[in-house]
Amino acid sequence: MRAYNFCAGPAALPTAVLEKAQQELLDWQGKGLSIMEMSHRSADYVAVAEKAEADLRKLMNIPENYKVLFLQGGASLQFSAIPLNLLGKNNKADYIHTGIWSEKALKEAKRYGDINVVEAGIKVDGKFAISEQSEWNLSDDAAYVHYADNETIGGLQFAGVPDVKAPLVCDFSSSILSAPLDVSKFGLIYAGAQKNIGPAGLTIVIIRDDLLDQAKAEIPSILKYADQAKNGSMVNTPSTYAWYLSGLVFEWLLEQGGVDAIHKVNLEKAQLLYGYIDSSDFYNNPIAIPNRSIMNVPFTLADEALEKQFLKEAEENHLLNLAGHRSVGGMRASIYNAVPLEGVQALIRFMDDFAKRNG
């Protein structure tokens, strides 16, 4: 049987997608070869790539004045690529700091420009939260404002989209496609694929056309968004299999009814899990309710000494990858689009049984 996988990334993929990939692995659509063996310049592969982009545009209602790039190097490479591409004419940017991933982004950006750090992570009644925008010290002349919508490690998520004058740049790695989004509010959106899009090895960048000419002169051409846009994300050989698999995930999402439909399921999963944790004396979630992530749910046990036992027994019950990130400890259930409601129900049953036996 397939276990329920709560890994933060690389994360669960829909079973139907894996089955289709398995079916097509040796002989893609009667062509006598695997898509992994196919030239990225072939008409067949270009059609696969173009369909994946078209389906993503449909899922996210991406306006025509935005380019969609399928890149490599993970979201972490974009921590450098973004300032290199967007600070060519104005060397200043604002970075909103709410946790570990937004901190990694701003540390890289500081190597390339004058970065104003907006400290927005706060504590409210002992719980982690994000401060009101009225309290942020934003610059008047920033080239862009950067934030991470969902701090995957901390389980801290923005309750809405910040309203700023400068182009808004956002890391959506762990929340893309989980809820409806107005792409037109952003200058640039980026996301590593290995959480809600597909397997590791692919990074999506969605950039507004007017930002394609802002790059620093010395930027490597492989990192230059304008060059990638001009070459259909194929300045060099792309991650062909990851791109194909992501396309299958987009097809699957459309079959589920699109982002609106999957968002309803995601809310149900999150409400069930948080509801159980809040009703329990044995488990605790450290995040203020308005800023709780619907994708990454961290929690601690009443007795830290029981953590190893909890993880061992969870695995015996086919509930995998529930350990929190090494930097914060505790537990974390990542309940991305591909984690079914039944998986969350099974997790809650196990948590309840464990609490009764050890509380």
From Swiss-Prot:
GO biological process: L-serine biosynthetic process; pyridoxine biosynthetic process
Localisation: Cytoplasm
Cellular component per GO, a single term: cytoplasm
List of residues binding L-glutamate: R41
EC number: 2.6.1.52
Binding, pyridoxal 5'-phosphate: A75, S76, W101, T152, D171, Q194, N236, T237
Pathway membership: Amino-acid biosynthesis; L-serine biosynthesis; L-serine from 3-phospho-D-glycerate: step 2/3; Cofactor biosynthesis; pyridoxine 5'-phosphate biosynthesis; pyridoxine 5'-phosphate from D-erythrose 4-phosphate: step 3/5
Textual note on the cofactor: Binds 1 pyridoxal phosphate per subunit.
Known partners and oligomeric status: Homodimer.
Protein family membership: Belongs to the class-V pyridoxal-phosphate-dependent aminotransferase family. SerC subfamily.
Protein name as annotated: Phosphoserine aminotransferase
Annotated source species: Acinetobacter baumannii (strain ACICU)
